């Protein structure tokens, strides 16, 4: 059992989250959701021990915890074997065991024997002696059984590296496995393999994901991190969580409206009572001795009315204010009207591409007109990103055959799957104005706020320090202001939070230009009105 108690974290004098409390039990399959920038990845790193919380504690019963990476850029110079050995904890378990064996031969006592026993226990838990067999089975399960484990990661395509990351999950022996956006760039068959592994594994999983289909198929509980105080916990699957959340927010809204209504009523009663009391007090005339008794009665009535008013005011002060539902940023945007009315925006005819004399794509043929939404499908490593990059002129393959024709004066905007910004050391605001130079300063600020970026983040945070979802939002903001005739999107839902994905779905559904899209997000594909699917 892992118990988070009042965990808080601050960065650059900004509180990311506070008072986070929840328990992870053996075998739990938990989805961790929340808006971009709420601190989900940071929380995973805290649980894994990579960073320390500002306050609070992580209490465990000795469980082995590991975070499995989705992005392998840090390990590109390592071999497949070395990478998986490191991220699964096998390397550290082996090295510690070897060290304690050596130490025991030099200094045998009760203390060294105890430490040796702990190292041996970890060595056996991670099945270090059988790791060669483990990695072979894991690679085979990830449909990579024919690759050489001694080959370096930088020699594989992006799609193949995604599968290698999947194999690392299969090879892990942690009690709690932390996954951060594990379906990013993973093809449909890979997602199914991962879902099956999670559902049948005895390990606990804490999964950060915005893939609704994947969460629906894996998460038995949902924890919602909103970037404020505490978390919202739901012992429900994803669809049930959505309904329960909607109902809970509506109930909170109704309670607050009732509170406001009662508050206004009591205020009116107290105000009217005060007016009557003052009116009664002003009407008596002390100089008229003949009306002494009448004045006395009026003073007493005035006093009684004032007392009643005071009682109502006291009730008003004691009225408990219920928790107010925070307004959710409703991200709504549309792509500007297209400038081109041309019949064809881009035409790809019998295109084949190869590297190292090995054909990786083709032949591929498709034509994009205004209103078309073309989905490019294929397994990891099939060359989908290579195709898009070649269309955009971003790479030159060793060999290609076929033809690409772009519509004259057609404005094409491309978002690659890395979602990188051009000015890494500059703010989101600087990047948006660089990508959309015609934007006025106040318009650029308002657009970024509308896309859900924190006001402090907009001008003070470097692009390199943004979360993946925040970077993607800056790119989408730029795309929405540039009137593109053709949009080319490579895994656009990577890292985006669910409200932004839903806003993108709506915008694409209403978009009159052409779109070429690579995506494995099943809900997203279903909701954007794909007109043609191209399998490569």
Regions found by a protein language model. Name each.
Residues 250-292, 298-305:
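ABC ATPase nucleotide-binding domains
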Residues 112-123, 295, 309-319:
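Short amphipathic alpha-helical coiled-coil/interface segments
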Residues 98, 283-286, 327-331, 445, ...:
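Short coil/turn segments at secondary-structure boundaries
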Residues 325-340:
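Short, flexible cytosolic linker that couples an ABC transmembrane/permease module to its adjacent nucleotide-binding
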Residues 1-256, 336-536:
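ABC ATP-binding cassette signature C-motif
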Residues 124-125, 129-135, 301-313, 317:
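Alpha-helix-centered segments that form part of catalytic cores
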Residues 93-104, 119, 259, 263-277, ...:
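Non-transmembrane amphipathic alpha-helical segments
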Residues 278-283, 318-328:
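Proline-centered turn/helix-capping motifs that create local helix->coil transitions or kinks
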